[in-house]
A protein has these predicted regions:
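Secreted/periplasmic carbohydrate-active enzymes, especially glycoside hydrolases
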Residues: 1-194, 206-207, 258, 282, ...
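Substrate-binding/catalytic cleft of secreted carbohydrate-active enzymes
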Residues: 191-487
Length: 636
């Protein structure tokens, strides 16, 4: 994780020849090279030279630190330098340069990044040189599905506000971003959504090397108005538009640049938001665009220029997130429904029918705005939304941990944990500080269980194309959001092991259904089992198995939980977390097994494996069982 080291900051003013390259745009999805040049004079020709492919196969240590970066550099064979004669009057050129059949496409499983160097020559001398990194990839959508190079993808993402407590600013070096993304990949993520900001080039480059889909966002959280409205701010909106163009020009070649959002939770003119989106889309159509993240929350619309929709609901009661704050009520299924493994959002996204009560009646409503409340106008007669573009759920999760006060000592940089100190003082005033570790552990177990319910519901939804967590790690800005399974330094808090988290957040997740987690001994249940699967290789000779396991409670276990330990933690585990017998599988014993053969897995997406019939074991007293589903195949 980026550390607070003193580094020299270099600021340069670079003079260039008047025959200079203004920018390079590589349209690699269709294997074309487009070069945009600053207007110049008196040059004869320039040469594009494809130099190398970068392949990123890397192993991460326990916390992703101190390792070498084992990139394998490959040079494409039989691709000579190519000379193009150019008129001095040409300022925009489109040149074709085929890479040949040996060139590989870029995606999360084969993140192959190419480097292009372009030089302007005159009389054998180099007047100007530019280098660009790119990948062969094309993002598209069809109805409710997202595709990369015609292969369906599902976004397993997280919000990121670029908060770095030790420095107060985002790192600009590649290695720091490789650690950030590499750690998140270990937790099954393949997507980052940046909240009202655009990360630096090093972030896009690291994401390209590691196969992360990045969504940048205009730096705005507010209302957009049309010209003529009394609230219209021409300078503000022109600034946002130019910032978007600059981001696209600077980073658009990098293959990780997946999406572009117009801002966070915008209100105001939908027509003007759509216009701004259209201008950016016309400027650079290599990415997918969305009007914003959770715009017009209670009265959303899918706009004509939307390539995908990011939000939390399509009307007051058509919710596709598991939990909500009271200011955004009604609450979600995690908060209101019986615990079980049965929920999905398909009917909420594409309902069989619409009732008249769902449309808006207009007027003024209160919304959350930053850390405060604001009133906004709602238009009358808003039509019910049936999306025709992919849907991504916005800022899901937000399950709080009680603070871990031992974390305070980690804040050795510019950001001071005054909020954590205040929380500690409050607990001490109430005589509860001695129980702080217990509160931390208990709240963590509850948060992990809630995240499991929420993510499995998202993966169980055929009509959903991705989710964006808030957050995989704590967010120490804009108040306090201790909602991550990792703290603000990307260190696991210990509530759930990385391997257990990946059981419900990865590119291959088993999704058995259970109507309830509370059953009677002897009951017969049927579980339909589905599989979210995106790995490039299929599965053959697939066998599904379900096992009932009785968890025996060890004597004195609760007392054992109270004792703190100073032992070294396991990899990625918070040092203050004491694992007890009840937290492990040590007391499990097999009591019943049910298995069945399944069809080979040859595709991607949400697949149905079949149904397993099970009988709940008889028991004299209340007992805690684990029902463990597993999938085996010849090539898993």
């Amino acid at each position: 994780y980026p550390s607070r080291k003193e580094k020299d900051v270099e600021i340069r003013l670079q003079l260039s020849h008047d025959s200079a390259l203004y920018g390079i745009r590589v349209s690699a999805g269709c294997r074309l090279t487009k070069l945009r040049m600053k207007e110049g004079r008196d040059f004869e020709h320039f040469e594009p030279l494809y130099t190398q492919a970068v392949e990123t196969r890397r192993e991460w240590t326990a916390q992703g630190k101190g390792q070498d970066l084992p990139y394998r550099i490959e040079t494409l064979e039989n691709l000579p330098e190519k000379i193009y004669e150019v008129s001095a009057l040409d300022t925009r050129l489109t040149l074709r340069y085929p890479l040949g059949e040996q060139a590989r496409e870029w995606d999360e499983y084969d993140p192959c990044v190419y480097e292009l160097t372009v030089r302007i020559l005159r009389g054998g001398s180099v007047l100007c040189e530019r280098t660009s990194h790119f990948g062969l990839r094309e993002f598209t959508h069809d109805e409710l599905k997202l595709y990369c190079n015609d292969k369906e993808i599902f976004l397993r993402g997280t919000h990121d506000g670029m908060s770095f407590p030790l420095t107060g600013y985002a790192p600009m070096d590649l290695d720091s971003w490789l650690r950030v993304y590499g750690t998140s990949r270990e937790y099954g993520l393949n997507h980052y959504r940046y909240h009202t900001c655009c990360p630096p080039k090093a972030a896009f480059l690291a994401a390209s090397y590691l196969g992360i889909y990045v969504q940048a966002e205009l730096a705005f959280w507010g209302s957009i108005y049309e010209a003529g409205d009394e609230n219209y701010d021409r300078e503000q909106q022109e600034f946002l538009l130019q910032e978007g163009i600059r981001a696209l020009d600077a980073f658009g070649d990098l293959p990780s640049y997946f999406g572009m959002s117009m801002g966070n939770e915008l209100w105001g003119s939908k027509a003007e938001i759509n216009r701004i989106m259209g201008v950016l889309k016309a400027h650079d159509d290599r990415h997918l665009y969305t009007q914003g993240s959770n715009n017009h929350q209670f009265v959303p619309s899918v706009l004509p220029n939307d390539d995908f929709f990011s939000g939390v609901r399509f009307s007051t009661h058509r919710l596709f997130r598991g939990s909500y704050a009271m200011c955004d009520a009604p609450l979600g299924f995690v908060q209101t429904q019986r615990p079980g493994a049965y929920w999905d959002y398909d009917e909420m996204i594409s309902p069989a029918r619409i009732t008249g009560s769902e449309s808006s009646k207009g007027g003024t409503i209160q919304i959350q705005y930053g850390t405060g409340i604001r009133e906004v106008e709602v238009g009358e007669g808003e039509a019910e939304v049936i999306p025709h573009v992919p849907v991504v759920s916005h800022e899901i999760g937000q399950y709080e941990f009680t603070p871990d006060f031992h974390e305070i000592e980690r804040y050795t940089g510019v950001l001071q944990p005054e909020n954590m100190k205040i929380f500690r003082e409050r607990m001490e005033e109430k005589g509860l500080l001695g129980y702080a570790d217990e509160y931390f552990r208990a709240s963590g177990k509850l948060a992990a269980a809630c995240y499991k319910l929420e993510l499995e519901a998202a993966l169980r939804s055929a009509n959903l194309s991705g989710f964006q967590l808030l957050d995989i790690k704590d967010f120490p800005g804009q108040g306090t959001a201790l909602v991550g399974i990792m703290n603000a330094f990307q260190i696991n808090k210990g509530a759930i092991a990385r391997t257990d988290w990946r059981m419900f957040c990865s590119d291959a997740v088993l999704l058995p259904t259970l109507d309830s987690f509370v059953m009677r001994g002897g009951d017969c249940i049927r579980s339909e089992v589905k599989l979210r699967y995106y790995r490039p290789e299929g599965l053959t000779n697939v066998r599904l198995q379900a096992v009932w396991l009785l968890k025996k409670q060890a004597a004195g276990d609760m007392e054992h939980r109270k004792r703190r330990t100073e032992r070294q933690p396991e990899e990625g585990q918070n040092a203050r977390w004491q694992k007890s017998a009840a937290d492990s599988d040590a007391g499990l014993c097999g009591t019943a097994v049910q298995a069945r053969d399944c069809a080979d897995v040859t595709g991607r997406g949400l697949l149905t494996l079949g149904t397993i019939a099970l009988k709940v074991p008889e028991c004299e007293n209340n007992a805690v069982y684990t029902l463990r589903f597993s999938l085996t195949s010849d090539n898993a």
